[in-house]
């Protein structure tokens, strides 16, 4: 009788040594994100974090998100260093809408076969996003699952927790007719609409390496999502913010109403800002209607802020000083009956 060959976890497709190599590779990047509230070091069963002592009645705010099919482009064109920033941005930009300061972040990286170099690049991007937003990368999960993913494919998910003073929560209840709307510029499509973007590339048979306004089209499409946390925390301290809307999936039509009272609508002047060239390219090459553009993409606006009209000039000056491109794009008006809550004129 032949003795069966002894099997190992590695024979089944899971390389523990590769996982350990990844942890060693990312230690310095993760350490850079540490906050004073974090207790212990990377690698424990559970990550510990104290609440900052400056809060009298702290309220925790949580969010989870992914990068969607933008990952498909990143994988196909082997550009893995920015999707980690995207992952963090999608979470922390949701938290700041409530006025919350991000505290800590955890990531989930899943793949069929762990490529240490690729994973190091991705997680380093996650650490960079955490650094930009001032939150600690305190843990995560790297799942190597043979048979679950094809080839070099991987998927990402992120989870973030922030904190806000209970009395300072921004929830849209203060919004009223006469408020002004400020927009913060996006860096591109951010992390939404990529299934349509990929369809436009397929139908138009465009070369993603073609030049568009001085750089390859693919670089426009993979530009990382802008993180607005630090400038908005400063704005919140110095102004009276009534509401903020993170313009993600669903675009203007679906995200702005999420922070408006039922008796209010947003009137947006569509010519008050210039679309980044990548959106013009998508609209033309995909023959996409303008309504569909505003439903699918941010069209150059990553965040919309509602505030009293008398606060606009100071807010624009502060945001500009913080390196943001910001514009006055409209106002809040009284909604009549069952009118749409967003009107683009």
Curated annotation (Swiss-Prot):
UniProt similarity note:
Belongs to the AIR synthase family.
Keyword Nucleotide-binding on entry = yes
Taxonomic lineage is: Bacteria, Pseudomonadati, Pseudomonadota, Gammaproteobacteria, Alteromonadales
Keyword Cytoplasm belongs to the record: yes
Q: Which NCBIfam families match?
A: purM
Compartments reported by the entry: Cytoplasm
The record lists its disulfide bonds as none
Q: Which UniProt keywords apply?
A: ATP-binding, Cytoplasm, Ligase, Nucleotide-binding, Purine biosynthesis
Q: Which InterPro entries does the record associate with it?
A: PurM-like_C_dom, PurM-like_C_sf, PurM-like_N, PurM-like_N_sf, PurM_cligase
Q: Which GO terms describe its biological process?
A: 'de novo' IMP biosynthetic process; adenine biosynthetic process
Q: Which Gene3D superfamilies match?
A: PurM-like C-terminal domain, PurM-like, N-terminal domain
Q: What GO molecular function terms would the record report?
A: ATP binding; phosphoribosylamine-glycine ligase activity; phosphoribosylformylglycinamidine cyclo-ligase activity
User: What does UniProt give as GO cellular component?
Assistant: cytosol
Pathway annotation from the record: Purine metabolism; IMP biosynthesis via de novo pathway; 5-amino-1-(5-phospho-D-ribosyl)imidazole from N(2)-formyl-N(1)-(5-phospho-D-ribosyl)glycinamide: step 2/2
Give the superkingdom in one word.
Bacteria
Protein name per Swiss-Prot or TrEMBL: Phosphoribosylformylglycinamidine cyclo-ligase
Q: What organism is this sequence from? A: Shewanella frigidimarina (strain NCIMB 400)
């Amino acid at each position: 009788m032949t003795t069966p060959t002894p099997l190992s976890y590695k024979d089944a497709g899971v390389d523990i040594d590769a996982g350990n190599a990844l942890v060693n590779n990312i230690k310095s990047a993760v350490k850079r994100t540490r906050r004073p509230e974090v207790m212990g070091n990377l690698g424990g069963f559970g990550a510990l974090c104290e609440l900052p002592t400056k809060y009298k009645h702290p309220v925790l705010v949580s969010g989870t998100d992914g990068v969607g099919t933008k990952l498909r482009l990143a994988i196909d064109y082997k550009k893995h260093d920015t999707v980690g920033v995207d992952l963090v941005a999608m979470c922390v930009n949701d938290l700041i809408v409530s006025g919350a300061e991000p505290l800590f972040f955890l990531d989930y990286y899943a793949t069929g076969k762990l490529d240490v170099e690729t994973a190091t690049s991705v997680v380093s991007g996650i650490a960079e996003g955490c650094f930009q937003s001032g939150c600690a990368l305190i843990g995560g999960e790297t799942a190597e699952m043979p048979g679950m993913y094809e080839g070099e494919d991987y998927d990402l998910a992120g989870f973030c927790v922030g904190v806000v003073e209970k009395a300072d929560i921004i929830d849209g209840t203060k919004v009223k007719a006469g408020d002004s709307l400020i927009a913060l510029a996006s860096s591109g499509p951010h992390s939404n609409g990529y299934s349509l973007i990929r369809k436009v590339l397929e139908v138009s048979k465009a070369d993603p390496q073609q030049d568009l306004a001085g750089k390859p089209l693919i670089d426009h499409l993979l530009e990382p999502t802008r993180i607005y946390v630090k400038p908005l925390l400063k704005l919140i301290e110095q102004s009276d913010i009534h509401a903020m809307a993170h313009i993600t999936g669903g675009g203007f039509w679906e995200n702005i109403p999420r922070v408006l009272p039922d008796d209010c609508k947003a009137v947006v002047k569509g010519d008050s800002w210039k679309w980044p060239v990548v959106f013009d390219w998508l609209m033309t090459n995909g023959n996409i209607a303008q309504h569909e553009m505003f439903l699918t993409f941010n069209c150059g606006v990553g965040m919309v802020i509602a505030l009293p009209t008398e606060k606009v000039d100071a807010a624009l000056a502060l945001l500009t000083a913080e390196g943001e491109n910001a514009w006055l794009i409209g106002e809040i008006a009284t909604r009549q009956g069952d009118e749409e809550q967003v009107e683009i004129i």
